[in-house]
């Protein structure tokens, strides 16, 4: 394996930590060190590790049917659960990852709208589809004018012809967003956004009036609005869209809806989802996959999601607030400049002088000093008993108040060590 592992986001030196076992909110590495897990496999383990009900149903299902070319009952049950829970979703299709869900959603939106171009946030993250990963982390010399941001490939070898199919707009700038979408109205058929904001640990969140304005203009221009809730579905019983009462045309999902096993899903209105239907002959969008809707992921997902009651989400929100309050105190007590941003079970620790409103503000506030502190905290937290990536804390129902308080103390210890010159 190049560099010794399969996920570049896990880069640590001189080598990554290898997991050996885990239970609840505790994960133990190959050297026998146990830490509180605030990553939860990139937000997919909302009940933590080895949730008994999920493990039991997976074991039962494994003895009956691992996978098959035919659909199974679990697929129907999970689809019904998602339709009943998410207000904008009338129908669902399953796949195997959030990246795949976004790719299929774009296909559906293009087929429905008859337009090929896609619009997304500058700095927005939507998985590894090469169209959507463009301009995820662009640098200032590549940005171009704010009113017409340049599209920059994220990986070498991305065809220019593909990049030409993407349009960018800034977060939390309603006039510029409206102008860009209106200017490209004849070509853009899909607009995709994580309703939280830039997502993936950035801590830069969308303002409600921006999301409302985006819904209004996309409806006016006949564009399919896609909410990427692969991460943000965990912020509430009906996802982020349920929290803010803004309904998209399509929703993409993944991570927690699989109960810890691989999964992705696209859900939406009957009108848009009809592009997958075979009832009237050959469908506009042909969608299939070897492991799509496999009964193992469906069973694990249905069981995990059934345990996520409104009370469970209330508990996760209280957990996130307790952590947020504690981290804020830790910053104040140690004299560091920074902010703590919380949305439900996701909490970000930012070492910026001000709260950034979009990608460009975030970039400019990541000064060498702020970046050094952020990296030092990230490097010291494993030594203090925490598993955290990018200073983003992703909670689970397995984490107790005692775990939260211990985590706050660990962060404060790391900050004090940095004050003493360690880790920087």
What kind of region is each of these model predictions?
Residues 1-424:
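Conserved N-terminal phosphate-binding loop of PLP-dependent enzymes in the Aspartate aminotransferase
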